Each structure stands twice: as structure tokens, then as C-alpha cells.
Amino acid sequence: MTDYKATLNLPDTAFPMKAGLPQREPQTLQRWDSIGLYQKLREIGKDRPKFVLHDGPPYANGNIHIGHAVNKILKDMILRSKTLAGFDAPYVPGWDCHGLPIEHKVEVTHGKNLSADRTRELCRAYASEQIEGQKSEFIRLGVLGDWSNPYLTMNFANEAGEIRALAEMVKGGFVFKGLKPVNWCFDCGSALAEAEVEYQDKKSSTIDVAFLIADEAKLAAAFGLPALGKPASIVIWTTTPWTIPANQALNVHPEFEYALVDVGDKLLVLAAELVESCLARYKLEGTVIATTTGQALELINFRHPFYDRLSPVYLADYVELGAGTGIVHSSPAYGVDDFNICKQYGLSNDDIISPVQSNGVYVESLEFFGGQFIFKANQNIIDKLVEVGSLMDTETISHSYMHCWRHKSPLIYRATAQWFVGMDKQPESGETLRKRAVKAIEDTEFVPAWGQARLHSMIANRPDWCISRQRNWGVPIPFFLHKESGDLHPRTVELMEEVAQRVEKEGIEAWFKLDASELLGDEAAKYDKISDTLDVWFDSGTTHWHVLRGSHPMGHESGPRADLYLEGSDQHRGWFHSSLLTGCMLDDHAPYRELLTHGFVVDENGRKMSKSLNNVVAPQKVNDSLGADIMRLWVSATDYSGEMAVSDQILQRSADAYRRIRNTARFLLSNLSGFNPATDILPAEEMLALDRWAVDRTLLLQRELQEHYGEYRFWNVYSKIHNFCVQELGGFYLDIIKDRQYTTAADSTARRSCQTALFHISEALVRWITPILAFTADELWQFLPGERNESVMLNTWYEGLTEMPADFEMDRAYWERIMAVKTSVNKEMENLRAAKAIGGNLQAEVTLYAEDSLIADLSKLSNELRFVLITSTASVAPLVSAPADAVVTEVAGLKLKVLKSSHAKCARCWHHREDVGVNPEHPEICGRCVDNISGAGEVRHYA
């Protein structure tokens, strides 16, 4: 038997079937570094329009987790796709370096008795070490960026830039000093930003407390009575017994109805709507003897339960009837609403009672409870209320309560002297910050769109921003306050610039070691140099100002405003939020044009990642087991607008999808063996009809993918590329062309037409997958035929694809109809193979019984119809001639019948043909193969 293998154009490529990503990817990273890929991208981008994505800085502490990986991969996919779209899209990674978590780590390692200077020194060293670790982990993900020159909030230039930004805000009239209740953590010993607060369930003691009337006549008059006749008390309900020692007022809603209830030996004032539930709680029976509005109770005085002072009634719209008594006790030092209402009624800062120290312990001078930790004092306060006869009821409830995000310990509101940015404070010029921010939100694009309403509601309802902290490791607030008046030095803005210049050279240490006389001279004795530091959200929130236009200038045609900020959904209350406020103060607009938000990563059951649940997916382990490209493919395939589910099983599905894409690429490369685009490529008009369709289909898909990339809809990109590889290529085109590719003469028009199409498809595909499968695309690029530059990233979307003419006879709709016919034929052949009626498709002879219009379509392919259907013979007949046993298909007007061929099998092309052995020199092969080996070769026109 003759071996005809040498006469076939069998596929051949060195592109490996096995990806070996965990081993190969680090080699690719080394290659990118050795060729200076990022620097080359900046060179070729000099004359391109710029696209700026400003990196939200991760905190320089610990290893990266799966959420970090998602964030960085999304950013990289966007910037790679923008580069391919013809933009200069730099990426400068950043790190958030100051703040309590790092200070806490240093204290744990080195103890709490460090000097402030030593603490800062160790914090800077620790942050630097953490950054190097995270940097290598981000690079391993395939993220292209200026990794040798990142921005760090602890860089001297950025610390100085932050001080200059603060100076601009002071100059603009946005900053003020105030006594206000702020989120306070005893473990931190500092105020916390809203973004540093999380909510957890907490068990608390609730108490109903009676405050005895002091103005009996006024209370009687308010209820329309000549006299009370019995002792009367107003009853409050609270979940914070520890605030009772600081009580200074009682709040009622002006429009609610309040009842005077006779319970036998005394009278109680309660919200009328809650009388029944309150009496049941107190195990009392009573009768309502009069009602009035909250408005009528205003300024009536009651007595504090155990201190010799009065508590007046103030009106407050925030009072609710959902629980309690309808009366709220007010401790202005420990509640934002309490504070605001008391200030409205003229309470001065000096009048506010604030007995809780920064560590959560009452001052020693507090009668009954001095020196006690507030949460431990709760029971002692309850006991005292019992002793004085004021406790009506106590219960234990579980409720959502604010906790420190770092220590997981309960927080309180605590009035302290802090520096604030005023949301509604009238600046030197223009609108208030709140109005500016609301307008800026309206001018910003949001992906997903619901982010706009979320950020709007946060801005509309947020309090003033407390920007000061009482920590060592932070950018200083370089203010000098007059010792007598407490006012800022009149040259504050000028002095801040002098400090900034020093910080630029020496870092924040320059302020802390500064002697006031160095700047103030003889005035120094009159001023205090404050030691407060800035909220870390101010650090990251001002990076747009001192990084984009300072340490990493990235201004483009519309200034140093970023085109895009991209972070997790928690950043509506974090970086998006603080950046918006600083941008509106400094530039009167948001520092971004568009905000993209991604969801949190959860497991396949929707649960958060947790070591206790053993469901943590570590990106480092994924890199080592599957490869970063698999993780990148998972990110691209997942709709990031909601929660993003991941597990080992989900990643394995991504690995399976990856193999299908890789195998398609390998098939393309293997069939480009011996193809030189410089000499072998055919013009479109010389290509076969099916090949022209394949290139046209690739062009249409490329347009769709460009649109999806532009809209950041990566899951659409993934699904369309995957479907193209599996269905339109693998399930149709590539299947059909195998016969032509393998059996026709190597340099025939039929084969070169096919290779031309494969080359164009490969050039397009390698670019399509580059933003997602960064490593694999780079590998594929090295194996493509023809001269090319060092990296696919140094190119733009492929421009060699051609569109079918509008009048092309075998147009797109035509091939859609042919695909439908082929699908029906395949379905029947699968049934026959399953029934063992035929061994393979080429054993089949198919007859298609069709309506006239479909006959016309099928007849256009002439004798090449069999190559499209991948059968040994294919014939067409009128539908009316279909035998009774013809199979009805899903295609309208089509029936078919498949028979097993009785002809011999060609040893070369495997078709069963009647002319096998007709040529005595080649008794084992068909006439077509004889012609392809030793004759002029077969001629194809369509497929």
C-alpha cells in the first residue's frame, strides 16, 4: 500500500498544544522587561491622543487578594484595549502609604513605647517593604505599567503636594476648626473617616428612663390642664446607657402627638402612638388623660435622673416612632443629631458636657462613674437608675452597630476639636462644596449607571468631612494657632508653602522636627504648632492634584483630569468620594470623567471569601497552578457590575474555555505552515467565496469587539471570541477547509486563498485576545508568519480585513442559510453514527430535498456542496420528490436522506468515490487526488 502522507499539506507548528502557563508566563514577563515594552509603548504613543486611567492606590499592607487581582486585571484590559485602539494609555500604579494599619503593624512588632520619630521611620520602611511584595504580585498578573516609577503617597513630592492642596482649600475658605461628634475608635485613639466604619451586629442594653418634671405648671399648661396633681416624668428610650451622664436635653418631634398617661401613682409623658407598647413593657396599666403636640412641649425643663441639672425639651425632626417612647434623650457630645439640635438652641462649645476620654474611659471627676470604661459602666448606670427610681425597663437587643474596620471594635460618636471641610460652608467664591459636588456627579459618566444615584445620595446626606487625625504616621496639618484666640495664623497659606518646600526635601519629618521660631520668629511664643495629621482619605483623595499634574504629569487636551477611575463598589464612600470633594474644591469639577465600579468577589454560593469558610481563592495559587491568563479569562467572562463568583471549579471552566481558544489558535498557525504573507497572500477578489465570507465575518466581529471593549463589556468580548472559535470557526469554517487545505497542491489558489483567510483571521484574533490573554497573545504573536515587531502590544487593531461587496452573490445572508443546512445535515449524521449506520461523515451520501429558493442556493455551490457538508457526495432534488422516509429538518422547506456510500474509500482524502482506482498507477486513490498529485490540480471556486 502506497503511503500518500508526503503528498498532503499536513498542519505543522511549533506552537505548543500544552500551554504550561505557570512556567511560561514568568519568561514572558522577563522578555517584556528586557525589550522595555512599557517604555516603547510610551514612545509610540507620543503623537497619539491620551487616555488617562488614574490608579486608585491600594494600601501598602499584606499580600494582594483576589479583589486586588480583579481590579488590576480590569485596569490592564482597559489600557491594553485603548492602546490597540490608537491611544497613548499610560499606567502609573500607586500605593496608599500612611495611616493607622501600618502604624498598628509597627506597634505590634516593635511595641507601643516608640518615639514619634522612630514610629514614622519604621512605618516608612515597613510600607516600602510591603510595596515591593505587592508590586511583584501585580506584575505577575501581566499588568503593564510604570512599575519602576510608581506614585506613593509617602513620596516627599506627594506629601508636599498634599500640603499644597490643603493650602488651596484653606485659601478657598473650605476648612474650619470645630467641635463636632466624629466616629471615634478607642483602639485607634483617633477619629475615623466614614469609609473606615463597618457595621456588625452587637448586643446592647436598652433602657427606658424617666426624667422628673421641673416646670410642673408649664407641663400642665401644655396639656391644657390647670395642674398635674401627681408627680410627672417624661420617658426616654436609648440603646446607649453610657451616654446618660452626658445628657443635656430631650428631643420630641414637633408634629407628633404626645400623651399624658396616668399610671396610678404618677404621670408619664409618652408618644401617643406608643403608649400601649410602652405600658406593656413597663407592666403597668394606665389611662391617657390628655394629649398635645410636640411643639407645645418645647423648652419645658425636666430633671436629670442623678445629677443636679436640667434637661430642656428641644424639637427635632429626626425623632421617629419605630421603637422606644417617641422621646430621644440628647447627649450633644456623643451624637451628630443631638449636637446639631443643641447648637441650634444656642448651646456653646464650652457648655457641652464631654466626660469620655480618647481611650473610652470616663474622666476621674465624673460623679459615680469616674475612671470606668464606658461599655463596662453600662450596668453601673442601670443600677444607679434603679437606685434613684428612674428606670422603667431594660432589655438586651442585637442590632447593627458601627465598628472600626481595622480593630473590629465598637465605635462611638465623640465630640472633639477637629479640622473639617465644610459641605455647606460658604467659600470665598462660588457655590458650596455640596452644590459643586452634586453638579459634578451629574456631569460624570457611571458604569454601571446606578452608581450615579448611589454617590449622589451619599454626597447629598453626608456631614462635614473631618480631615484631622491624632496619629504619628500621616501627612501633617501644618497650622499655627494663636494661643489666646485659637485663630489660624494670618499668613497660614504662605507658611504652608514654606513647610511644603521643606517636606519636598525631607518628607513629613520636616514638620515634626520644625521649631516654630524657624518660620514665625518672635511670633512663635504666641502660637501653638499643632500635631494633627490628615485623614488618609485626604492622602489618596488629592492624588489627582499632585500626581496627575505633579510627580507624574499626565495632562492632555482637557487638562489633568483623568478619563477614568475604576475601583470596587465600596469606593463610592471611599476614594471616589474623597476625590470628588477635593476635585470640586481645587478645580470646581470632579477629577474624573467616568467612574467604573466592579463588585466584590464571592464564592459560587454567593458567600464572602473567608478563611473560616475555607473558600478563599488566592491569586498567587491560581498563578502557580493554572496561570494568570486563566484568572484574566475568568475576570473577562464575569459581569463585574454585580458580585463576581469564583471557585476552583469556576476557574477550571475558564481553563477549559482557554484550551478551546488556544486550540483554535494552534490550528490556525499549523495551517499557515509554509505561508509567506509577503509573497503568498491573495487579493480579496481572487479568494474563494467561503474564504471571503470568513474574512468578512471576522471584520464584522472585530467591529463588535471594538465597541464592547470601548464600553468595558469584557464578558461580551469573551463570549463572542469564544463562540467565534468554537462555532463559526471550529464548527463550520475550519471543518470545511481541512480537505482543501490538506489535499490541494501546496501553492494552489484554492490553498493560498484559504491560508490568506487564516492569516487575516490570526492577525485579528491575536489582537482581540491581547487585552484578556496577555501572555498567550504575546506567545502567539511570536509564531505568526511574516516580519513583525517585538510585541502585539506595539500595534493597533488589525486593518487587513476586507468587507464583502454589497452585490456579492454569496453574501452574508447566503452563508447563514448554508450554515443552517449544514447544521441539519450534521444532526442527522450524529444520529446515524450513534446508531452505527455509518462510521464517519465521509461514509455518507446525502440528498437534500428542497424548495426552489433553497435549491437555487445549494446549486450555486455546484459539485463543491459536498465539501461544505463534508460528505463524499451531495445532491439536490425538489422537495416534492422526497421519499416518505426523508428526514424533516428545522430548516423550512428542507428534508434530507443520508445513505452509507457503497464506493471505495480514497486512501489519500478518505472520500468514498466511484473513481477510486480508475488510474492504474494509483489504484488506492480517487481521480481528484490523482489530479492534485500529478495533474493540473483541482479547481475550486466556492469552498
UniProtKB/Swiss-Prot annotation:
Residues reported to bind L-isoleucyl-5'-AMP: E567
Annotated GO biological process: isoleucyl-tRNA aminoacylation
Pfam family, one: tRNA-synt_1
Major subcellular site: cytoplasm
Top-tier EC class: ligase
Matching InterPro entries: aa-tRNA-synth_I_CS (IPR001412), aa-tRNA-synth_Ia (IPR002300), Anticodon_Ile_BEm (IPR033708), Ile-tRNA-ligase (IPR002301), Ile-tRNA-ligase_type1 (IPR023585), Ile-tRNA_ligase (IPR050081), M/V/L/I-tRNA-synth_anticd-bd (IPR013155), Rossmann-like_a/b/a_fold (IPR014729)
Catalysis: reaction(s): tRNA(Ile) + L-isoleucine + ATP = L-isoleucyl-tRNA(Ile) + AMP + diphosphate
GO cellular component, one term: cytosol
GO MF annotations in UniProt: aminoacyl-tRNA deacylase activity; ATP binding; isoleucine-tRNA ligase activity; tRNA binding; zinc ion binding
Motif ('HIGH' region): 58-68
SUPFAM superfamilies, per the entry: Anticodon-binding domain of a subclass of class I aminoacyl-tRNA synthetases, Nucleotidylyl transferase, ValRS/IleRS/LeuRS editing domain
Stated role: Catalyzes the attachment of isoleucine to tRNA(Ile). As IleRS can inadvertently accommodate and process structurally similar amino acids such as valine, to avoid such errors it has two additional distinct tRNA(Ile)-dependent editing activities. One activity is designated as 'pretransfer' editing and involves the hydrolysis of activated Val-AMP. The other activity is designated 'posttransfer' editing and involves deacylation of mischarged Val-tRNA(Ile).
Family statement drawn from the similarity comment of this UniProt entry: Belongs to the class-I aminoacyl-tRNA synthetase family. IleS type 1 subfamily.
Subunit structure: Monomer.
Listed name of the protein: Isoleucine--tRNA ligase
Biological source species: Pseudomonas savastanoi pv. phaseolicola (strain 1448A / Race 6)
